[in-house]
Amino acid sequence: MRKIYLFITMLVLCVASVFAQAPEKFSYQAVVRNASNQLVTNANVGVRVSVLQGSTYGAAVYVETHTVTTNANGLLTLEIGDGTVQNGSVANIDWGNGPYFLKTEIDPNGGTNYSVTSTQQMLSVPYALYAAEAGKIGRAHV
C-alpha cells in the first residue's frame, strides 16, 4: 500500500512540474497590406520571423517560417516558436544576453518572396516585470 501511495505521489509531482513549465512560444499579430497599401484579406501569406541579437542588424539567433491566413481585416495571428524552424531554437535563446529584436518579413502572395516589414526591439511585458520582482523577494519568515 505504501508503494502505491509513493508511486501516485511521484506521478502527481511529475505531471505538475510538466504543466508548470512556461511555453517556449509567444503571440504575434500583424496587419498585412500589399504594395498598393491595400489590406490583404482572407488570404494565405508567407511569414518569416527572426530574433536578432544586439541590434536591428544583429545575428539571427532564431528564424522560423509560417504560412497563415489573414482575416477579413487583414490581421494575421501566429505563435512564434510554433513555426517551421529555419535556424536556432527558442529554448536556447539567452534572454538575459540582450537586447533582442524581432524582424518580420512577409510575402503577401503566400510564398517565400519575403520583404522586410518590421524590425522592433523586444521589450518586457508587465507579466515578466512582475516575475522578475517576485524572484528578488526572499522567503517569508514564519
Regions found by a protein language model. Give the residues of each.
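Family-positioned intrinsically disordered, low-complexity linker/tail segments enriched in G/S/T/P
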Residues: 3-139
